[in-house]
Structures are given as C-alpha cells and as structure tokens.
Amino acid sequence: MERRALGPDGFEVPVVGMGTSRTFDVRGRAAEATSRRIVEEALDTGANLFDSSPMYGEAERVLGLALDGRRAEAIVATKVWTADDDLAERQIEASLHHAHGRVELYQVHNLVAWPARLDRLEQLRDEGLIDVIGATHYDAAAFAELMTVMRSGRIGFVQVPYNPLERDVERAVLPLAEELGLGVMLMRPFGRGSVLRRWPSPTELAPLEPFGVTTWAQALLKWGLSDPRCTLSIPATSRPGRMTENA
C-alpha cells in the first residue's frame, strides 16, 4: 500500500483508508462480527486508517471493538461535532475511550464551533493524545469558511468530498491546500454510491488494467488519488471483501 504525508508534519497515511458513516452504525453480535472482519481485511491490506465520528451513531463503538487486539496497527481518525462545550467534552471522552486511549487524527466536524473546538484539540495534541488536527465539510457553500480555517495555520489537513460528480474542491480548496502544504482526505469517492450505479463493461475497463484497475470502484479511487494534491481516500463498505478490492 502506497503511503503519503498528510500535511506539513509528515504524518504518513495509506492512500486508501476506510470510512464508517452508516456502514458501522450497527448493533448485535452478527453485525459487529462482520464489521470486525472488514476491519481485519483492511489492516491486512495496509488500508489501516479508519475515519469515524460521534455523528455516526454506533460507528465509533463498533470500530473500537473491531480493533481490539490490533489497535497498534491502526490509524484512527474521528471528529468532534457540537456547539455545546460540555457535550464536546463528553464526545471527546467517549471517542478516546472507543479508540483505546488516543486518536491519531482529530477533526472539527463540519466546522461546528471551530474556534473553540480547535482550542481544545490543540490542548489534546499538546498532551500527546492526538497527532494531527483537521477540519471537514461536505457542502461547497461552506468552503469559503473552510479556507479561512486552512489559512489559520491551526490544522494539518481537510476532509472534503471529491468524485466525478462533486468537483467543487478543484476551484479553490485543492489549490489552497497545495499552497499551504495541507493534506486532503477524500470523503464520498463513490458519491454515496451514485457514481457506482452505472458500471462500465469489462471491455470499457480493459485499458485501465495496466494500472491495476479491474473494477469501477478501483477506477474511481484512482481518479481521485491521481491528483497529487489529494492524500488519501476513505471509501466505506459494509461488505467483507470490498476493502481487499479497494486496496
């Protein structure tokens, strides 16, 4: 698995990680066992970065269970997502618990109360509980504010959507990330599945085989990662075998 530096501090990440939105919001032993199998497959292929959030229901808890016994092999990314200071502390406490005591990449989710949240994340970084701070947003209407945060010098990376149907980041976010040396984590590489609805035929994919591409999902991941300004992509899946294919 190729690895790239996420931001100016040179923290290395795999070019393909895994998101947990929706797919890891599960309960019950059978569903949790499936999630563990998916995580183990990702670790075995080197796709050892897992992105979550308190916003994703049970995902942080389920991910933590799945990493039991292999936490040292993983890079955990999560977020804080609230305008309430007390709730933010409870979220952070729960996230650290589920992540076995530390979180490598901690993000302000959708820029909610970002000045105060960055203050707290910087404290956690100083305490050695996190490595790199980031910020996320899914909506192009918020990218101007995201760019303000990028220029603040307080974050090392951003997480934004990027796929053939969502290309707003090309206009200003990616150029600014390149200028500032910030990492870029790609959410929604498959457009929440919309880009996958029309699968090309094997004949159409054949020209991509020399590049290691045999599926449409692989082609979409390569599409985003072929831009050197993009550091990694985090597809989500609820199906065993998919992470092996994606990696």
How does the language model describe each region?
Residues 26-30, 53-61, 81-88, 109-116, ...:
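Acidic-and-aromatic substrate-binding clefts and catalytic sites of carbohydrate-active enzymes
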Residues 3, 109-247:
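Beta/alpha (TIM)-barrel catalytic core signal, keyed to glycine-rich beta->alpha loops juxtaposed to Asp/Glu
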